Every structure is written in structure tokens, then in C-alpha cells.
């Protein structure tokens, strides 16, 4: 496989090409933590999928990050002749980007893969839902509030967390793969993935 690290849209980006592409030049987009637990990524590379990432860490799925993602996808499709629709892998906080992007631009996404997703900033990084054991991360919470223009008081009214876009995901009828362990103390299942499960069943 060939890996290329480059800058685009003012951000660090990575793309890894398989030895031989699938017939449709399929690709998977790691929304966050590019090198973490790469079992699925490596398997897809072996099967002929490209793998990519753009560094929008610490933007918490805000509108600017979603627009960077749209522009990055347009760049990838045009520059490398990739399939027009992305398969997006949202691991942990990567779900902030993966879900919010898919909700706004469902026509650009062919499949959404979520692994231990964070779906509510009040669960993580705020750590406010402590009845389920979520610890939060104070330093990240300060960054999050600053990026989103929130205070401790206004954070409770913030509607940009992925959990508020679940109905839009269901309406888009995009294939969704959800992987979750029940011992996650950073983003407890009950405050995050379970919201997705419960609401999808209702919708």
C-alpha cells in the first residue's frame, strides 16, 4: 500500500491507496484517531479500499468542520477518481463529525460505521451524565466550549450534538453499522449509542 501525507484546506491529511482498487474505487474515511485500532481499516485496504483522514480534531462537529469535510470529499473524488459516496468511520469523538456530516449531506455518504460513538457533548467531554459513570475530560470540555461558543450555562441548550440528528439519519436511510462495548467510561453506552438504538427503533 502507498501512504501519502499532505496539506489541504489548511489541514493535515492522509490517504492510503490499496495495492489494487475495488472496481468502484471505494474508500473509507476515518473521521478521527487515524491509527487507533486499525483492524477494520487494514482489512478494507486488503480488500481494495482506499483509506483517508483529514485533521479536524478539537472542532467537535461544528459547522466549520462539516464544511471542511464537504470540501475535502469533493477534492478527493475529483483528484483521485474515488467513488462519489464515502463510507465514514466515526470512532469515539469521531462520531461528532461523522454523524453531523452525514445528517447535513446524506447524498455524500454511502455507509456510516460508528464504533463506541460520542453523540452528546454533555456526556463527553462535559461528563455531566454521571449516573452512568461517564467521567468527562475537563481540559477537552474547555476546548469544546470555546470552539462552540458555549458557557456552562448555555451548553445545556446546545442542539448541535449528534444525538439531535438521529431522525435525519434515519430519514436518509443510509446503512448504519454500530459497534459498542458496555464498559466505556468515557462515552457511556446509555448516554450515547443507546440513544441511537432506541430512536432508530422508534423511527
What are these model-derived regions, one by one?
Residues 71-92, 106-109:
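Gly/Ser-rich "nucleophile elbow"/oxyanion-hole loop immediately N-terminal to the catalytic nucleophile
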Residues 1-23:
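N-terminal cap/lid segment of alpha/beta-hydrolase-fold proteins
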Residues 100-152:
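Hydrolase active-site cap/lid region
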Residues 90-100:
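Glycine-rich nucleophile elbow surrounding the catalytic serine of serine-hydrolase chemistry
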Residues 36-52:
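Short amphipathic alpha-helix adjacent to the substrate-entry channel of hydrolases
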Residues 24-33:
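Short beta-strand element of the alpha/beta-hydrolase
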Residues 134-192, 197, 201:
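The feature captures the conserved acid-bearing segment of alpha/beta-hydrolase catalytic domains
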Residues 60-81, 100:
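Alpha/beta-hydrolase active-site loop
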Amino acid at each position: 500500500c502507498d501512504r501519502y501525507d499532505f496539506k489541504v484546506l489548511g489541514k493535515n491529511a492522509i490517504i492510503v491507496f490499496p495495492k489494487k482498487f475495488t472496481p468502484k474505487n471505494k474508500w473509507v474515511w476515518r473521521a478521527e484517531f487515524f491509527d487507533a485500532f486499525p483492524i477494520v481499516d487494514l482489512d478494507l485496504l486488503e480488500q481494495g479500499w482506499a483509506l483517508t483522514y483529514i485533521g479536524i480534531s478539537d472542532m467537535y462537529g461544528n459547522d466549520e468542520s462539516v464544511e471542511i469535510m464537504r470540501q475535502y470529499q469533493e477534492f478527493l473524488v475529483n483528484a483521485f477518481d474515488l467513488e462519489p459516496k464515502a463510507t465514514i468511520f466515526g470512532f469515539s469523538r469521531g462520531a461528532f463529525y461523522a454523524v453531523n456530516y452525514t445528517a447535513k449531506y446524506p447524498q455524500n455518504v454511502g455507509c456510516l460505521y460508528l464504533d463506541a460513538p460520542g453523540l452528546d457533548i454533555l456526556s463527553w467531554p462535559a461528563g455531566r451524565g454521571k449516573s452512568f459513570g461517564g467521567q468527562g475530560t475537563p481540559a477537552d470540555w474547555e476546548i469544546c466550549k470555546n470552539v462552540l461558543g458555549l458557557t456552562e450555562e448555555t451548553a445545556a441548550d446546545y442542539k448541535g450534538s449528534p444525538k439531535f440528528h438521529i431522525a435525519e439519519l434515519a430519514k436518509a436511510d443510509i446503512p448504519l453499522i454500530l459497534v459498542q462495548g458496555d464498559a466505556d467510561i468515557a462515552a457511556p453506552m446509555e448516554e450515547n449509542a443507546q440513544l441511537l438504538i432506541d430512536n432508530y427503533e422508534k423511527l
